[in-house]
Amino acid sequence: MAQYEFQTEVSQLLTLIIHSLYSHKEIFLRELISNASDALDKLKYEALVDGTYKQLHCEARIDIAFEEDAQRLVVRDTGIGMNAEDLRANLGTIARSGTKAFLSTLTRDQKQDSNLIGQFGVGFYSAFMVASKVEVITKKAAENTVWKWTSEGQNAYTLDEVDAAAFPVLEGVAEGSAGTCVVLHLSQENSEFATRWRLEEVIKKYSDHIAFPIYLHYLQKEYDKDGAVTDTQKKVDQVNDAGALWKRPKSELKEEDYHRFYQTLTRDSTPPLLYVHTKAEGTQEYVTLFYVPAKAPFDLFHADYKPGVKLFVKRVFITDDEKELLPVYLRFVRGVIDSEDLPLNVSREILQQNRVLAAIKSASVKKLLGEFKRLAECDGKKYDEFITQYNRPLKEGLYSDYEHREQLLELVRFRTLSESVPEDGWTSFAEYVSRMKPDQKAIYYIAGNDDRVLRQSPHAESYRLQGFEVLVMSDDIDGIVMPSVSKYKEWELRAINRLGSEEELRPNEETDAAAQREQGFKPLLERLTHILSDSVKEVRLSKRLSDSVSCIVIDENDPTVQMERLMRATGQTHKSKIKPILEINASHTLVQKLKESTDEAFVEDLAFVLLDQALLIEGMDVGSSVDFVKRVNRLLARG
């Protein structure tokens, strides 16, 4: 008998599951049935693409049996099965980053955490919530060896080669069938899970729409008038519906049907925000059923995110790991695509080049974006919930999906400096346009990483004073995405921290006086440009500033701060740093002092301090924090 230690994360996981989710124990059966369904799907797919499996003939089914007196529960599938290597990889160690994420995501809310178990792919271990010992007897398809994995949920497990007789005999399951049998030795307090009524209740609740039949084996007893058992018969009943819900007409389905199927599909017990059920007929025949989860998937912004859409061909499962079924920015969508026109033996390479699938993808994107628009028009409160979760991915689409950019521009939302909108309220481009000043030529925005800082930005001072609304874009990708979006309908989009965006601003004085002032400041501007030449392109007077003394402006053709950081991180930028422009407020006391001073040391110190504080407000690095502090101290000492 070979004994192995669990990987550290498995031990932590077992402890957390057993002690954190005790009031939602029934979910263990949901997880075991879902795993069985996955195993059946995998075998079905392998039989299509791998000649090794094509000769195997076995009814795809899930069987559940129990022994009430012995407090034993059996969950058996005729799926792909496992060998010793699979058992060690899948049940002894946890190689996926999702499990570590699960451990860090536990909320102490038992209902929410019981939902997370399945989404993070660690559902098997929930069996230890109800069992003092778990045995896994399994035979991989196309192999002859039977293996037995055993653990009491502590720190170790055993793994042995066993005889085929180790599989429990179940009516309807062909002898010698591949697949996996999970045997749970229930603890005393969980004896309810060795009763027919409780098992039927849980299966109906969570697994009614599993695509394979689930059979419950039980003993039907007959009693006499005194309550004595007079006859016992073995019975096998199919408990679940086992239909492809997406194939049924929408007129036959209720909202609760869609919600139950969503739970089965995603193991998410929270109802989805919306679902979209489409049947296409004509040159191409396919059905799609898409869901938008109420909460964003945990791996939404992981590079190795798991796709949420399953592909079927004529109801035969093909893959749930294909990222090309929908655009990357719609990776939060869950659901199924079932095509009548794709070949059953379709490979991943064929999928990526297939015209049928490309057409389904394009139509699905249009349908989903149309549903999002309908939601925005019909239920603003619900759309706000949607945007709170998925605004950022939709913005990614503005950058990557030119074909649907116009639709996406109507869907994305932003915060705003408008006093008519609460600070935590959303506004659309269309709503912004409806509030624009007469003859206003552009839509103005400011982008950065901190909403609070952006709201106090010096760049917005004159815009606010002169009645120009400014959109606040504080997602980390806004500074990368928005420069690629030049227009919304006929209005240009202008970042107020970019040179040229100030064209519509009125100068603080008459034109002649402004020109005269500019001329009067010319020597100072040239002087400051020379002092700061290693750090800035130019120092100029500002039309944007009314109260603040200085601000940093990006030249018209230079990348934003966010884009420059991305370029630097990916090695795409030149060694020489891109220099910004420093704007100063001619009306500010400090600038007046600069103009009047003949003290070169004072002018140099104050010039660098004005630059550094403008950089700090932008969230940019100052050249040297030590030099900055020394300069501030020297200026303070002057009084």
Curated annotation (Swiss-Prot):
<comment type="function">
    <text>Molecular chaperone. Has ATPase activity.</text>
</comment>
<keyword id="KW-0143">Chaperone</keyword>
<dbReference type="InterPro" id="IPR037196">
    <property type="entry name" value="HSP90_C"/>
</dbReference>
<dbReference type="Pfam" id="PF00183">
    <property type="entry name" value="HSP90"/>
</dbReference>
<feature type="region of interest" description="A; substrate-binding">
    <location>
        <begin position="1"/>
        <end position="348"/>
    </location>
</feature>
<dbReference type="GO" id="GO:0016887">
    <property type="term" value="F:ATP hydrolysis activity"/>
</dbReference>
<protein>
    <recommendedName>
        <fullName>Chaperone protein HtpG</fullName>
    </recommendedName>
</protein>
<dbReference type="GO" id="GO:0005524">
    <property type="term" value="F:ATP binding"/>
</dbReference>
<comment type="subunit">
    <text>Homodimer.</text>
</comment>
<keyword id="KW-0547">Nucleotide-binding</keyword>
<keyword id="KW-0346">Stress response</keyword>
<comment type="similarity">
    <text>Belongs to the heat shock protein 90 family.</text>
</comment>
<dbReference type="Pfam" id="PF13589">
    <property type="entry name" value="HATPase_c_3"/>
</dbReference>
<dbReference type="InterPro" id="IPR001404">
    <property type="entry name" value="Hsp90_fam"/>
</dbReference>
<dbReference type="GO" id="GO:0005737">
    <property type="term" value="C:cytoplasm"/>
</dbReference>
<dbReference type="InterPro" id="IPR020575">
    <property type="entry name" value="Hsp90_N"/>
</dbReference>
<dbReference type="GO" id="GO:0051082">
    <property type="term" value="F:unfolded protein binding"/>
</dbReference>
<dbReference type="GO" id="GO:0140662">
    <property type="term" value="F:ATP-dependent protein folding chaperone"/>
</dbReference>
<dbReference type="InterPro" id="IPR019805">
    <property type="entry name" value="Heat_shock_protein_90_CS"/>
</dbReference>
<keyword id="KW-0067">ATP-binding</keyword>
<feature type="region of interest" description="B">
    <location>
        <begin position="349"/>
        <end position="565"/>
    </location>
</feature>
<dbReference type="InterPro" id="IPR020568">
    <property type="entry name" value="Ribosomal_Su5_D2-typ_SF"/>
</dbReference>
<dbReference type="InterPro" id="IPR036890">
    <property type="entry name" value="HATPase_C_sf"/>
</dbReference>
<keyword id="KW-0963">Cytoplasm</keyword>
<feature type="region of interest" description="C">
    <location>
        <begin position="566"/>
        <end position="639"/>
    </location>
</feature>
